[in-house]
Every structure is written in C-alpha cells, then in structure tokens.
C-alpha cells in the first residue's frame, strides 16, 4: 500500500515557549467566492521541534506526520530563515 503525499507548509514561528514544540502561523491568500477579492487567511499549527532549534520570528518549513499529541500533527523539517534579533 502506497503512502499519501504529506503536506508541507512554510510559515513563521510565533511561539517557542513549550518544550520541543513550536507554534507556526501559515498565511495563505484566497479569492472571495462571490466578489473575487483576494483575502488573507492565517492558521496556526503546532509542530514538533526535537532539538528546540527554532526561535520566535524564524521562517520554517513543517511537514505533516502521525499524531504526536492532541494538537500536534506536524514536525519541523528545516529553518528557512532565522529571525534578526535587534
């Protein structure tokens, strides 16, 4: 039996306060069904970060995986861009 293609999202880390868990906001744009205007949507996902390497503000790529907890169904694949600390 062949495994399904897993979803991969890119987003920004908004929280890294939990141990081995990050919260990532993924923003998408869609057209309104009636008026056709482009609307921004955002959704938060909790992702597993084994080494606690991602920090708040980083741009990361996450991949769908088996359920790791009640809310956690994604894991960190890579850190695309690190946040600039001022």
Curated annotation (Swiss-Prot):
<dbReference type="GO" id="GO:0022627">
    <property type="term" value="C:cytosolic small ribosomal subunit"/>
</dbReference>
<keyword id="KW-0689">Ribosomal protein</keyword>
<dbReference type="GO" id="GO:0019843">
    <property type="term" value="F:rRNA binding"/>
</dbReference>
<dbReference type="InterPro" id="IPR019979">
    <property type="entry name" value="Ribosomal_uS17_CS"/>
</dbReference>
<comment type="function">
    <text>One of the primary rRNA binding proteins, it binds specifically to the 5'-end of 16S ribosomal RNA.</text>
</comment>
<comment type="similarity">
    <text>Belongs to the universal ribosomal protein uS17 family.</text>
</comment>
<protein>
    <recommendedName>
        <fullName>Small ribosomal subunit protein uS17</fullName>
    </recommendedName>
</protein>
<dbReference type="InterPro" id="IPR012340">
    <property type="entry name" value="NA-bd_OB-fold"/>
</dbReference>
<dbReference type="InterPro" id="IPR000266">
    <property type="entry name" value="Ribosomal_uS17"/>
</dbReference>
<keyword id="KW-0687">Ribonucleoprotein</keyword>
<keyword id="KW-0699">rRNA-binding</keyword>
<comment type="subunit">
    <text>Part of the 30S ribosomal subunit.</text>
</comment>
<keyword id="KW-0694">RNA-binding</keyword>
<dbReference type="InterPro" id="IPR019984">
    <property type="entry name" value="Ribosomal_uS17_bact/chlr"/>
</dbReference>
<dbReference type="Pfam" id="PF00366">
    <property type="entry name" value="Ribosomal_S17"/>
</dbReference>
<dbReference type="GO" id="GO:0006412">
    <property type="term" value="P:translation"/>
</dbReference>
<dbReference type="GO" id="GO:0003735">
    <property type="term" value="F:structural constituent of ribosome"/>
</dbReference>
